[in-house]
Structure formats: C-alpha cells, structure tokens
Amino acid sequence: MDLKVFDGQEKSELSMIEVAHAILAYHNEAMAFADLTNEIQQYLGKSDEEIRERLSQFYTDLNVDGSFISLGDNTWGLRAWYPYESIDEATVGETEDEEDRPKKRRRKVNAFLAGTDDDDDVIDYDNDDPEDEDLDDDQGPDDDDDYEEDDYDEDNPVEDDDEETNIEDQLSELHGDEFGDDEEEDEEDKEDDEE
C-alpha cells in the first residue's frame, strides 16, 4: 500500500496514529481495530513484538485523539466522515426492530392495600420474620426472665446503711505518707516557721 501523504518521510519517524489516520482516509471506510493495526504494521514494517509493545499506547491515542471515533464492536472511523447530528445514530447502531415492538407495561403494586384479590402482591408485615416464631417456641415455663426472690444472694447481702464516705475522707487517706518522705518535709517546715 502506498500512502502519498507520507512521500519523502522516513517510515521510522511516523507515529502509529498518523499512519492510522492515513489508512482510514485511503480506504474511506471504518475498520476493525485488529485490521487497522495489521495494516499499520505492514506499512511501517515493524515486527509483532514492536507492535505489541506500542499497542496499548496506540489504543489510548485512538481514544484521546479527536479525529477518530469508535463505532462500537471495536470498529474505528474518522470523525470527519460523520456530521455532528448523525454521530449518535452511527454509534448506537440499528435498533429500529426493538423500537417497533410494543413495550410491556409494568403493573404498579401497592403493598398496603387490604382485601385485594391478588394476595401474592400484598406483604404481610405481621408475619415477616421466621426467626420470631423460633424464639417463641423456645420459651418454656422455666425460661421466665423475671426477677424472683430466689435470686437474692444471702452470702453477699447489699447493705444500704454502710458508712457514708465523702470525697474529703478519701482524699485524706490518699494524702497520707505514701512515700515515707513527708515527715522530713514536715520537720523542715516547722523549723522554718520557728525562725
């Protein structure tokens, strides 16, 4: 294939995007990505390994470059071929058959209607948790959780008439000679006071 656009230029200096644009313009029709890549490889004379290394960058460049358009199914064309208004139609594809078929209307269901003929659609909120039934069955005459006088612990009675201790009493207990050095300080304080 001879692309006249690149006459006088070395093929090693050309980017894959430039060659892709020229190939699509030469064929004047959209091409599959694999076919486009194969033609680029043939034109540039690159090995399979060199193309594989640059393939992901080439695909990214196709997506980013504004002169290319994806037509679905990994088919690519030039954006200049499609007027602005027809881009959506070209990329969406043929869906006329689906639009002609009448759509099924969905029936609205009201879960709070009582006395309807179709009881399958009505939700019974009183009986919605099977675990509740299991708990009710487990309850027996011995499973009563209420407090009874038998639960009173005679070995450890709780007395209400304990000596009331206030915060001052507790602090004075803590303020005592915990470290054994308070007596020396107290004597020094007395000597200072006498002088």
From Swiss-Prot:
Annotated region (Disordered), positions in chain: 91-195
Bias kind Acidic residues: ranges: 116-171, 179-195
Any Gene Ontology CC annotation: DNA-directed RNA polymerase complex
Tagged with keyword Transferase: yes
Cited PROSITE patterns: HTH_HARE (PS51913)
Sequence ranges assigned to domain HTH HARE-type in this UniProt record: 14-81
Gene3D superfamilies: RNA polymerase, subunit delta, N-terminal domain
GO MF assignments: DNA-directed RNA polymerase activity
Keywords per UniProt: DNA-directed RNA polymerase, Nucleotidyltransferase, Transcription, Transferase
Functional summary from the UniProt entry: Participates in both the initiation and recycling phases of transcription. In the presence of the delta subunit, RNAP displays an increased specificity of transcription, a decreased affinity for nucleic acids, and an increased efficiency of RNA synthesis because of enhanced recycling.
Assigned protein family: Belongs to the RpoE family.
Name of this chain's protein: Probable DNA-directed RNA polymerase subunit delta
Lineage: Bacteria, Bacillati, Bacillota, Bacilli, Lactobacillales
Name of the gene this protein is made from: rpoE
